UniProtKB/Swiss-Prot annotation:
Gene3D superfamilies: Nucleoside Triphosphate Pyrophosphohydrolase (3.90.79.10)
Domain spans labelled Nudix hydrolase: 6-149
Gene (name only): rppH
Organism: Cupriavidus pinatubonensis (strain JMP 134 / LMG 1197) (Cupriavidus necator (strain JMP 134))
Family label: Belongs to the Nudix hydrolase family. RppH subfamily.
Protein name: RNA pyrophosphohydrolase
Length: 231
C-alpha cells in the first residue's frame, strides 16, 4: 500500500528498558541488527500496526510494554533506484514511518523470537541509547537519527553516557557472549567462535525472503546488502 507520493506507510519501534538501553534484533543468519518495524496494513492505525509488529517480531504483548511517546509526524526516507525492484520503479519511492518509543514493562524472558512461523531475528541485545550509526545503510541513517533524537525528550534521564558492553540473547531467552560489538559491526576473530544459543531459530530460505518485501526493514548490515528485496 503506497500513498500518492509513492511512500509505504510503516511503523518503527524503539524499545527501551529501565536503564534506557535500546533493543536491537539480529537478522536470521546475518551479522546485521535492526529495530523492529513493519508496514501498516489497510485499515490499521499506526498504534495497531505497532502492537502487531511487536508481537510478530519479538513476541511481546501490549501488557509487556508501555507507550512513552511517538513521533509527531511521518519521517520519510527515499530508496535509491538500485535498491528497488525493477517492476515497481517509478511508483515506489521509499517509506514514511511513525516511530514509537516503548518502555519494557515485562521481563527479558518475555521476548519470544519465534512467535510466528517466519521469524525475523535469531538473537537480540540491549545497547546504550546513543550508538554510532555508521553501520546503518546510508539512506536510512537520517531517519534513525531523527527518530532517536525526537524521542529522546521522553527519557527520564540523560542517556548520553559512554558506550558500554551489552549482552547478546539467543532464541527466546538466555545469555550469550558479552562483548562491546556495536549493532551491525562484524565480529572480531575472537568473537567468531560459534555461539551456543538456548533456542535455535530455523534459518529462512533466501528464496522465500526475496519476495516478501520491497526492501529491507531497518536493516543494519555490516556492509550494504547486495540484494535490496530481502525481507
Amino acid at each position: 500500500m503506497l500513498d500518492r507520493e509513492g511512500f509505504r506507510p510503516n511503523v518503527g519501534i524503539i524499545l527501551i528498558n529501565a536503564r534506557n538501553e535500546v533493543f536491537w534484533g539480529k537478522r536470521i543468519g546475518e551479522h546485521s541488527w535492526q529495530f523492529p518495524q513493519g508496514g501498516i496494513k489497510y485499515g490499521e492505525t499506526p498504534e495497531q500496526a505497532m502492537y502487531r509488529e511487536l508481537h510478530e517480531e519479538i513476541g511481546l504483548l501490549p501488557e509487556h510494554v508501555r507507550i512513552v511517546g511517538r513521533t509527531r509526524d511521518w519521517l520519510r526516507y527515499e530508496v535509491p533506484d538500485k535498491f528497488i525492484r525493477r517492476e515497481i520503479r517509478g511508483h515506489y519511492r521509499g517509506q514514511k514511518q511513525i516511530w514509537f518509543l516503548l518502555r519494557m514493562a515485562g521481563r527479558d524472558c518475555d521476548v519470544h523470537l519465534r512467535a510466528t512461523e517466519h521469524p525475523e531475528f535469531d538473537a537480540w541485545r540491549w545497547s546504550d541509547y546513543w550508538v554510532p550509526l555508521e553501520a546503518v545503510i546510508e539512506f536510512k541513517r537520517d531517519v534513525y537519527q531523527l527518530a532517536l533524537t525526537e524521542l529522546s525528550r521522553f527519557l527520564n534521564r540523560n542517556p548520553r553516557v559512554p558506550l558500554s558492553p551489552y549482552g547478546v540473547h539467543h532464541g527466546r531467552h538466555g545469555s550469550g557472549q558479552r562483548y562491546a560489538q556495536q549493532p551491525g559491526q562484524p565480529p572480531t576473530l575472537a568473537q567468531r567462535r560459534p555461539l551456543q544459543p538456548v533456542t535455535q531459530v530455523a534459518p529462512v530460505a533466501p528464496a522465500a525472503e526475496a519476495v516478501q518485501a520491497v526492501e529491507s526493514d531497518a536493516v543494519l548490515p555490516a556492509t550494504p546488502a547486495p540484494n535490496p528485496t530481502e525481507s
